[in-house]
From Swiss-Prot:
Taxonomic source organism: Lepidium virginicum (Virginia pepperweed)
Enzyme active site: S101, H126
Reaction it catalyzes: Hydrolysis of proteins to small peptides in the presence of ATP and magnesium. alpha-casein is the usual test substrate. In the absence of ATP, only oligopeptides shorter than five residues are hydrolyzed (such as succinyl-Leu-Tyr-|-NHMec, and Leu-Tyr-Leu-|-Tyr-Trp, in which cleavage of the -Tyr-|-Leu- and -Tyr-|-Trp bonds also occurs)
GO cellular component, one term: chloroplast stroma
Protein name, UniProt field: ATP-dependent Clp protease proteolytic subunit
């Protein structure tokens, strides 16, 4: 039986009364975000707006993005990544559970030295995919060209942020490569594995 989103007490600075807010609202106020679903336009826009708002509010205090996601839409994920690079505060990324596909791209986008994986977390990288079987030939060719550009961009970012040679990253992206937290650290996707 679902319990909904839990409520927690919160007292605004300078106010005497405590109010009850949903737990995510409370955590956002502490600069903690959660990506716990497929990456799509809606969650992407929510995370982007929170990062921008909180970076304007205080640009010297780190933001924390906790990730447990199977991936999702490439463009929406790239928008989150770009925002993480754009905002002034460092964005620390923490993988808890799974960071697969575009979610691993978001994970690697955290501030270098501030990318963490929980001990039993899993990370998966692969190349971007599409559903060609429904497309007309002309659309198929255009979509294939766009996918190739996206793959080149994603590969370039992984190379830059992991320090791995392009041939290693390209080879790994040919198929689904699942990694443990320590393997992701050896790959340069995360910097630290949280202590058990």
């Amino acid at each position: 039986m679902p319990i909904g989103v839990p409520k927690v007490p919160f007292r605004s600075p300078g106010e005497g009364d405590t109010s009850w807010v949903d737990i995510y609202n409370r955590l956002y106020r502490e600069r903690l975000f959660f990506l716990g679903q497929d990456v799509d336009t809606e969650i992407s826009n929510q995370l982007i707006s929170l990062m921008i708002y909180l970076s304007i509010e205080k640009d010297t205090k780190d933001l924390y993005l906790f990730i447990n996601s199977p991936g999702g839409w490439v463009i929406s994920g790239m928008a989150i990544y770009d925002t993480m690079q754009f905002v002034r505060p460092d964005v620390q990324t923490i993988c808890m559970g799974l960071a697969a596909s575009i979610a691993s791209f978001i994970l690697v986008g955290g501030a270098i030295t501030k990318r963490i994986a929980f001990p039993h977390a899993r990370v998966m990288i692969h190349q971007p995919a599409s559903s060609f079987y429904e497309a007309q030939t002309g659309e198929f060719i255009l979509e294939a060209e766009e996918l190739l550009k996206l793959r080149e961009t994603i590969t370039r970012v992984y190379v830059q942020r992991t320090g791995k040679p392009i041939w290693v990253v390209s080879e790994d992206m040919e198929r689904d490569v699942f990694m443990s937290a320590t393997e992701a650290q050896a790959h340069g996707i995360v910097d630290l594995v949280a202590v058990q």
